[in-house]
């Protein structure tokens, strides 16, 4: 299914429900049942995985993959909705070994586990709108976090998912986090094209909600006047690529999370120069090298409590899946930061 088809499918289903003259009460009941079933699915999977980890013992924190295949809040292409299964395939494809660079073994369930995807399309097919859909994503993340020692590592999807995920993490932990955000764009518009949940507005929602104390944005090279003004409004630390050579030493020795509930890392694949990751919706030359990103991640000091990898667009990837492998490696190295 193409990206446009995925984005318009929800409209077709809403029209069909309207044409069928489904009553508002019946539709509401149906939506509630679908949402409840979705949360039950995630809850039971998380409980199953956590019971195994508790039985095995010797683990304080385990990275837990949760897919959120949502792409309709993208302002350009909606292919990121198809990313989670492609990333999983690349993680386990066998072309590389199962260890992270820091020596964590991904085949050990105490290091990495997986509870599958939030059924976003099925929820949207019954007419659920974005306010409620964002709540479903948040509740799914909280459901994972209820099962100690699981910590969510979320596979997007477009960048709009970061708002409900960070909100859930902050609410569940009882306070704000520090965020390291790697991206070509600041994603801090108050609203983009009238959409407050746009992938270009996720960090405005996070900051106005008080879910982050510090927000560091690294890799920025496509920023408007509003992006800079919003950054100043929220006290965001924006590190643009035009000054990266000067900022490199600082960014490769970050210490975050003291005095708050931990560190959240959000990686938009387009933070990378398109020479390393062409499979993105918004190709922006002049980005970070893959080793730049790994140096920042590996050297970061702080308790990483959750994270996401977003905006990989399989529909723009190379034939051999180069960007899928890049996204998979990002997941592997984030797993090493989260698991303990």
UniProtKB/Swiss-Prot annotation:
Binding site for Mn(2+) 2: 183, 185, 268, 270
Span of chain positions assigned to the transit peptide in the UniProt entry: 1-24
Gene3D superfamilies per the UniProt record, alphabetical: Ureohydrolase domain
Pathway the protein contributes to: Nitrogen metabolism; urea cycle; L-ornithine and urea from L-arginine: step 1/1
Cofactor remark from the record: Binds 2 manganese ions per subunit.
Primary site of residence: mitochondrion
Residues annotated as binding substrate: 185-189, 193-195, 311
GO MF terms, alphabetically ordered: agmatinase activity; arginase activity; manganese ion binding
UniProt entry tagged with the keyword Hydrolase: yes
GO CC annotations on file: mitochondrion
InterPro entries on file: Ureohydrolase, Ureohydrolase_dom_sf, Ureohydrolase_Mn_BS
Cofactor needs: Mn(2+)
EC identifiers of the protein: 3.5.3.1
Keywords: Arginine metabolism, Hydrolase, Manganese, Metal-binding, Mitochondrion, Transit peptide
Reaction equations catalysed: L-arginine + H2O = urea + L-ornithine
Compartments reported by the entry: Mitochondrion
Residues noted as binding Mn(2+) 1 in the record, renumbered to the chain: 159, 183, 187, 268
Biological process (GO), any one: arginine catabolic process
PANTHER family: ARGINASE/AGMATINASE, GUANIDINO ACID HYDROLASE, MITOCHONDRIAL
Task performed by this protein: Catalyzes the hydrolysis of L-arginine to urea and L-ornithine. The latter can be utilized in the urea cycle or as a precursor for the synthesis of both polyamines and proline.
Family affiliation: Belongs to the arginase family.
Name of this chain's protein: Arginase 1, mitochondrial
């Amino acid at each position: 299914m193409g990206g446009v088809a995925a984005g318009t499918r929800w409209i077709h289903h809403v029209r069909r429900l309207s044409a069928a003259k489904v009553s508002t009460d019946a539709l509401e009941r149906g939506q509630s049942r679908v949402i409840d079933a979705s949360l039950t699915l995630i809850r039971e999977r998380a409980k199953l995985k956590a019971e195994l980890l508790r039985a095995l013992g010797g683990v304080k924190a385990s990275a837990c993959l949760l897919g959120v295949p949502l792409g309709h809040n993208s302002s350009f292409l909606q292919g990121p909705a198809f990313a989670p299964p492609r990333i999983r395939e690349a993680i386990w494809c066998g072309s590389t070994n199962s260890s992270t660079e820091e020596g964590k073994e991904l085949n050990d369930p105490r290091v990495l586990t997986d509870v599958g995807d939030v059924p976003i399309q099925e929820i949207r097919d019954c007419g659920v709108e974005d306010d409620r859909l964002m709540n479903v994503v948040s509740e799914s993340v909280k459901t994972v976090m209820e099962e100690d020692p699981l910590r969510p590592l979320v596979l997007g999807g477009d960048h709009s998912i970061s708002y409900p995920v960070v909100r859930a993490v902050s609410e569940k932990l009882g306070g704000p986090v520090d965020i390291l955000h790697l991206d070509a764009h600041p994603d801090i518009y108050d609203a983009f094209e009238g959409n407050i949940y746009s992938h270009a507005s996720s960090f405005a929602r996070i900051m106005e909600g008080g879910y982050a104390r510090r927000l560091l944005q690294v890799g920025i090279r496509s920023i408007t006047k509003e992006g800079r003004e919003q950054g100043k409004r929220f006290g965001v630390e924006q590190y643009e690529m035009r000054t990266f050579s000067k900022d490199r030493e600082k960014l490769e020795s970050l210490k975050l999370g003291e005095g708050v509930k931990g560190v959240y890392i959000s990686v938009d694949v387009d933070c990378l120069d398109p020479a390393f990751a062409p499979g993105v919706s918004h190709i922006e030359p002049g980005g970070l090298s893959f080793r730049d990103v790994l140096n920042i991640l590996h050297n970061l000091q702080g308790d990483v409590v959750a994270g996401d990898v977003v905006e990989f667009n399989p529909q723009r990837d190379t034939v051999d899946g180069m960007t899928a492998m890049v996204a998979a490696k990002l997941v592997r190295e984030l797993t090493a930061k989260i698991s303990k």
